[in-house]
């Protein structure tokens, strides 16, 4: 089975440069792309990261979201003939604002897989703006729905086979 990886373009974010690297290029604006990935060729499609919720949530952090109609996750998936309900797993590299904002658009029978410690950190209140309450609250709802959220632990679980030929580690 040949797997294909497709880049999903979720739009850009304009932000003050020192947000990326503390103290570097203070006052200078940078434009940063926001990407996710779609894995095709297996028994079902997989999505890695879901982008940010909407432009307004970026504005609440003093950033400018540049997400347009074509950047919406459902439209990015449609380019490859995939609907939200076709996706079996959503995997997250981490839960920052620009990576986990669209999980709630997937049905509850799509399993979101995240690192257990990342979920703990996201609900701790540390770095609050990077973990917006609506994004994290939805994950807690998934935690209380059978098979809607799967927690992995990098120190304990190691490599996980999602289907033959497709492996992941809890980031």
Task: For every predicted segment, state its role.
Residues 1-5, 40-45, 160-169:
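Beta-strand-turn-beta hairpins that frame and shape the catalytic cleft
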Residues 5, 39, 49, 87, ...:
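Divalent metal-coordination and catalytic microenvironments
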Residues 20-22, 61-63, 105-108, 127-129:
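Short, glycine/charged-enriched secondary-structure capping and boundary segments
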Residues 52, 97, 118:
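Short, glycine/acidic-enriched loop or turn micro-motifs at the edges of active sites
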